[in-house]
């Protein structure tokens, strides 16, 4: 690519999937520019690395670019996309650029509706601890590295494989994980679960004959793909058909302990004891997937165990913001009913005796409409729920699909719920809703993330 491409322009460069790729490209020596509707903290690091960042989308921004990379949120009607088409500048999706980067490495792609970011981070951390110095591109900030991405000197590139727009089908990894397959982004697949399943099957069938598919066989849809694969498969989970099986899971502080048993012929042997610095059974599964990859590339068990014990998580994935006046605040990206349920369950396991309050910002009108009843049932596990209005993520509003409607449906089932439409004024109002000693979970993939920095001012103290 270097002989033909020097200037790369990225539309939506502040997005979680874009800025990691931008950072790797900058470190490779490419000239990178980009635009975002709300550049800010998400693009400061890129500016420091030499990227030119434009606020807003204008046709003039693409001048001089050899290629334009767009995120999945950018429509064809975007003025920069239209200008690039008129100037005959190639326009590609972010996954196509990721696939180009992966061509020069041994690709490890992490797919699944839920758990991609954490699993990718775990894999990158273990490979780094094992001295393999991987390149990684993650949809969240790996706390230990302080970044979403890094250019390593080793042979492996670890990245998330995004199914939201089916662009993961551009990737050609040598190893892949599928954590789960769940109903989300169904507009991409014509509303058909069969089409969604088929896309994951195509993704796995792109693996070479010498590769490895690491699959969570606790998930029936994932397990059902195995008969159609020619690539070697490593099964993981809690179930009896797993090759790597987690047993004896216990809570340890804000984390967990568990034993890993490995199938040898027709029996299991106790292989590894793990201390994991992040909570929840879902994260035990994510760790099992990472262990499977690490064992394939030859990392010793002792190194795997140490890396998992040292792992401190990813930004906005059960991120402990702090404790203020006896109130513990945890921030999480969860925005799908299943993610919400898993995060609430994790919080309950860590703080079983404390009141649990969830402040949730629904994300996308289409998702809220499609999974309306599931949102109600998943949020019912909290003691109290505070709802904001829906974060559109660029979608047009749908009649009758509002945060207020969701709150009313919850109240009709006897749930304790409060609707706060304006997120800008929400922090003080949320503070007033919290009982003494509560745990507050702020959940959502939209602008609710901005609340984390406001709590010291709201509570009038620094976190303890």
Curated annotation (Swiss-Prot):
ATP binds at residues 112-118. The keyword Acetylation does not apply. The keyword Repeat does not apply. Pathway: Cell wall biogenesis; peptidoglycan biosynthesis. It is found in: Cytoplasm. GO terms for biological process: cell division; cell wall organization; peptidoglycan biosynthetic process; regulation of cell shape. It catalyses: UDP-N-acetyl-alpha-D-muramate + L-alanine + ATP = UDP-N-acetyl-alpha-D-muramoyl-L-alanine + ADP + phosphate + H(+). Pfam families: Mur_ligase (PF01225), Mur_ligase_C (PF02875), Mur_ligase_M (PF08245). Keywords: ATP-binding, Cell cycle, Cell division, Cell shape, Cell wall biogenesis/degradation, Cytoplasm, Ligase, Nucleotide-binding, Peptidoglycan synthesis. HAMAP family: MurC (MF_00046). This is UDP-N-acetylmuramate--L-alanine ligase. The lineage of its organism: Bacteria, Pseudomonadati, Pseudomonadota, Acidithiobacillia, Acidithiobacillales.
């Amino acid at each position: 690519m270097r002989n033909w491409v020097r200037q790369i322009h990225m539309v939506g460069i502040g997005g979680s999937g874009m800025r990691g790729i931008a950072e790797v490209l900058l470190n490779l020596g490419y000239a990178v520019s980009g635009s975002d509707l709300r550049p800010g903290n998400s693009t400061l690091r890129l500016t420091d690395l030499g990227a030119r960042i434009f606020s807003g989308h204008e046709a003039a921004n693409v001048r001089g670019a050899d290629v334009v990379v767009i995120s999945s949120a950018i429509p064809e009607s975007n003025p920069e996309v239209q200008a690039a088409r008129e100037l005959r500048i190639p326009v590609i999706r972010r996954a196509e650029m990721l696939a180009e980067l992966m061509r020069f490495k041994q690709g490890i792609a992490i797919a699944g509706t839920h758990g991609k970011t954490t699993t990718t981070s775990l894999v990158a951390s273990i490979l780094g601890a094992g001295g393999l110095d991987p390149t990684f591109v993650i949809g969240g900030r790996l706390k230990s590295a302080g970044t979403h991405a890094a250019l390593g000197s080793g042979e492996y590139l670890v990245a998330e494989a995004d199914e939201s727009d089916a662009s993961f089908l551009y990737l050609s990894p040598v190893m892949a994980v599928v954590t789960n397959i769940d109903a989300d982004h169904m507009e991409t697949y014509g509303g058909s679960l069969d089409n969604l399943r088929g896309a994951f099957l195509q993704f796995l069938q792109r693996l070479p004959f010498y590769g490895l598919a690491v699959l969570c066989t606790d998930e029936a849809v994932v397990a059902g793909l195995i008969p159609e694969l020619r690539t070697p498969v490593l099964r993981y989970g809690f179930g009896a058909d797993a090759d790597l099986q987690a047993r004896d899971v216990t809570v340890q502080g804000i984390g967990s302990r568990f034993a890993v048993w490995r199938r040898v012929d027709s029996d299991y042997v106790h292989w590894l004891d793990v201390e994991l610095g992040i909570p929840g059974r879902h994260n035990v599964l994510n760790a099992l997937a990472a262990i499977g990859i690490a064992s394939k590339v030859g990392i010793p068990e002792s190194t795997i165990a140490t890396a998992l014990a040292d792992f401190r998580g990813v930004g906005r994935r059960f991120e402990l913001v702090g404790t203020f006046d006896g109130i513990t605040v945890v921030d999480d990206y969860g925005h799908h009913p299943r993610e919400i349920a898993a995060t609430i369950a994790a919080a309950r396991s860590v703080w079983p005796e404390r009141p649990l309050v969830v402040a949730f910002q629904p994300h996308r009108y289409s998702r809220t409409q499609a999974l309306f009843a599931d949102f109600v049932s998943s949020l019912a596990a909290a003691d109290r729920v505070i709802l904001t209005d829906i974060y559109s993520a660029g979608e047009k509003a749908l009649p009758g699909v509002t945060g207020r409607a969701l709150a009313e449906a919850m109240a009709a089932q006897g749930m304790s719920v409060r609707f706060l439409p304006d997120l800008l004024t929400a922090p003080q109002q949320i503070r007033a809703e919290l009982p003494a000693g509560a745990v507050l979970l702020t959940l959502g993939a939209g602008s609710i993330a901005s609340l984390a920095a406001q709590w010291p001012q709201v509570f009038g103290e620094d976190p303890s």
